[in-house]
Amino acid sequence: MELKNKKLSLWEAVSMAVGVMIGASIFSIFGVGAKIAGRNLPETFILSGIYALLVAYSYTKLGAKIVSNAGPIAFIHKAIGDNIITGALSILLWMSYVISIALFAKGFAGYFLPLINAPINTFNIAITEIGIVAFFTALNFFGSKAVGRAEFFIVLVKLLILGLFIFAGLITIHPSYVIPDLAPSAVSGMIFASAIFFLSYMGFGVITNASEHIENPKKNVPRAIFISILIVMFVYVGVAISAIGNLPIDELIKASENALAVAAKPFLGNLGFLLISIGALFSISSAMNATIYGGANVAYSLAKDGELPEFFERKVWFKSTEGLYITSALGVLFALLFNMEGVASITSAVFMVIYLFVILSHYILIDEVGGRKEIVIFSFIVVLGVFLLLLYYQWITNRFVFYGIIATFIGVLIFEIIYRKVTKRTFSNNMYVKS
C-alpha cells in the first residue's frame, strides 16, 4: 500500500489532536491564565475542559455520520444548507487558523527572546513574530515531507518534557500555593479565564477535518476526540499544579511571556529553564507548521471555493497560490495589532461561534445522527453563556479587543455577502464522503 493511501490509526489521530492542543496554549498563554485566574488556574483548565467535552458530544455524533475533511462546515452545511451564514462561517473557520498563527507567533517570541538573552521590546518582539511566520511560510512554499508521520514523535517529545515538569514539580510542591481561592473576585477571574482558555482544547476539531483519512471513522473519530481532550486536560491540570505550586503567583504573572520556563527554575534549575524553553519553541513551531500546512490549507479552500475534492490530501498545497501568503500575512497582522490576551480572546470567540453553530446543527440533525436533545440544549446554553462572558470581560477590561472581536465577525459577514454576489460561488456536496 502506498503511504499516501495509508489511513491514520486511532492513536495517530489522537496524537495529531493532542499536538495541536498542547502547542496552542499550555506554553503560549499560560501566563495570561495566571494573571486572570490566579491560583485557581488548575480549576480553570478543568472548567474549560468541561466546555470542550460538551462541544465534543456534538462533534462525535456528527463526525461519526458525516465524514468530511471540511469538518464543522460540512456539519453546518448539512443542517442549514448553502447560504450566507454557511459561507461566512467557512471564512470564519479560515480566520480561526489565521488568528491561531498569530497566537503561535506571539508565544514563540515570548520564549525565544529570553532564551537568547535579547531585550524584550516592541521591535524585537515584532521582528521575531514576522520572522517565524515567514520561515514556515517559506518552508511550506517549498514543500514538506512526512509531516503527518513525524507528528506522533513530536507529540511524544512534548509529553515527555511536560511529564518531567509535572513529576519534578509535584515532588517539591508547596501545598499552600495550590489551595483554591474562593473569594468572589477570584472565582469570577477563574470563570473569565475559562472562557479565554476554551481555545486550549480547540485542537480536537482537527480530527473531524481529517476524518476521511482515519481508519474506521465512525468508530474512531468519537473515540479520538474524547481521548485527546481527556489526555490534554490531565496534562494541563498537572502542569498548572506544578507551576503555581512552586512559584508564587505574583512571580508567575511577572513572567507571563515565558511563564512555564520560569516556573521550572525552582525545582529543575537553569537546566529546567532551558529544557522548557526549547520544548516550548519546538512545540509552538510544530503547531504553527501544522496549522499553516494542514488546517489553513483546507480552510482556505473552503473559504474561497466552498468545496473540497472527496479525498483532499494533506500533501496538496493551496489550490490558489495566494492562499499561503494571505493566511500568513493576516496572521502577522493580528500578532502585531494585539497582545497575547487579545489574540487568545479573539481566537476563543471565533471558535465559540463555530461551536455554537455545530451544536445547533446537531440539534437540527439529531434524528439522523443520534444523541440526546437535553444534552445538546444544555451544551448550547453553556457555550453561549461562556461566549457572552468573554465579550463582557473584554468590554470591561480591554475595549480594543472587544471591538476587534466584533469587527472580525462583521467583516467576515460583509465579505461573504459581497464575495458570494460577485463570484456566484456555492457550496458543493463534494465535501461529503459517500459511503
Curated annotation (Swiss-Prot):
Keywords: Cell membrane, Membrane, Transmembrane, Transmembrane helix
Residues passing through the membrane, by range: 14-34, 44-64, 84-104, 123-143, 153-173, 187-207, 224-244, 267-287, 324-344, 346-366, 375-395, 400-420
Signal peptide location: none
Keyword Transmembrane: yes
GO molecular function terms noted in the UniProt entry: transmembrane transporter activity
Subcellular location: Cell membrane
Entry membrane topology: Multi-pass membrane protein
Gene Ontology cellular component list: plasma membrane
Keyword set includes Cell membrane: yes
Source domain of life: Archaea
Protein name as catalogued: Uncharacterized protein MJ0609
Species for this entry: Methanocaldococcus jannaschii (strain ATCC 43067 / DSM 2661 / JAL-1 / JCM 10045 / NBRC 100440) (Methanococcus jannaschii)
